[in-house]
Amino acid sequence: MLDPRARTLLKTLIERYIADGQPVGSRTLSRYSGLELSPATIRNVMSDLEELGLVSSPHTSAGRVPTPRGYRLFVDTMLTVESPIDSDAVTRLVQTTLQAGEPQQRVVAAAASVLSNLSQFAGVVLTPRRSHVFKQIEFLRLSDKRILLIIVTPEGDVQNRMIATQRDYAPAQLTEASNYINAHFAGLSFDEVRRRLREEIDQLRGDMTALMHAAVTASTEEPDDEETVLISGERNLLEVADLSSDMARLRKLFDVFDQKTSLLQLLDVSSHAQGVQIFIGGESTLVPIDEMSVVTAPYEVNGKIVGTLGVIGPTRMAYNRVIPIVDITARLLSLTLSQQ
């Protein structure tokens, strides 16, 4: 447990390091902390903080820098979120960009772009899981034994699937099949449709049964190229010296963007929590790079969490500025998707 003097000095050190990017010495701490302490007293407190693992001393400097553990204590107990940006202006920008009535995937992609533009780091969004409940389906004949299945979800998302059939179907037969499914099964999951079809198989002609079973099977298969993590503004991080000054670190960063596995895991974890979360590199096992942090928040559709969004940036980021950007964007994305 830190005493008030140590807390003030640690908070001042981290704020100055975030602002300047340079190790912070006792003279700077004396100037900005508001405490009337001698340089010797400040150095003693810094030594205590170093023993606690909250700050460290770079070999090339007499000053100190925060450790991941120090950042964690700072964001959990010392951070005052007073955004220097105009939150009303942010709200207007997000509302202008996230247009209700647009396809869901386009709205979600726009959110990633908004996060990137506002933070000047990288914006990331875990897209909503595909709905296995449908509002309407339609069959479109493409050629002999090839049919396009068009699925409209209750959220307004449109999904397409290819079906290879054992026989050719006339357009009138496809219309008959889609009308039957929409009339009897709309609003159900495809698993429930499969169960109902087994019960009603005697009432259907054999050709219609085969087509409907093919549609249900295709509907429950996720396409291989489905994007689950959308990233915008990766190039912004090339301007961040903390991440780009080391080639091996930069290569690892873009491997993270390319593979997306670790990001998917992190965003999935944060989707099970309420509100903004901060994952700090070197402190969280979910962040693969020590110099990287991720600020996330879940978003909802009609009160149900369906995904997560966030900002990826350096550990040395202005958290008090990024947190409200993420929070406002998540709230307005939730509102936009719920109005679809």
Curated annotation (Swiss-Prot):
Gene3D superfamilies: 3.30.450.40, Heat-inducible transcription repressor hrca homolog, domain 3, Winged helix-like DNA-binding domain superfamily/Winged helix DNA-binding domain. It comes from the Bacteria. The keyword Zinc does not apply. The keyword Repressor applies. Keywords: Repressor, Stress response, Transcription, Transcription regulation. It holds the Pfam family HrcA. InterPro entries: GAF-like_dom_sf, HrcA, HrcA_C, WH-like_DNA-bd_sf, WH_DNA-bd_sf, WHTH_HrcA_DNA-bd, WHTH_transcript_rep_HrcA_IDD. GO terms for molecular function: DNA binding. GO terms for biological process: negative regulation of DNA-templated transcription. HAMAP family: HrcA. Negative regulator of class I heat shock genes (grpE-dnaK-dnaJ and groELS operons). Prevents heat-shock induction of these operons. Belongs to the HrcA family. This is Heat-inducible transcription repressor HrcA. The gene is hrcA.
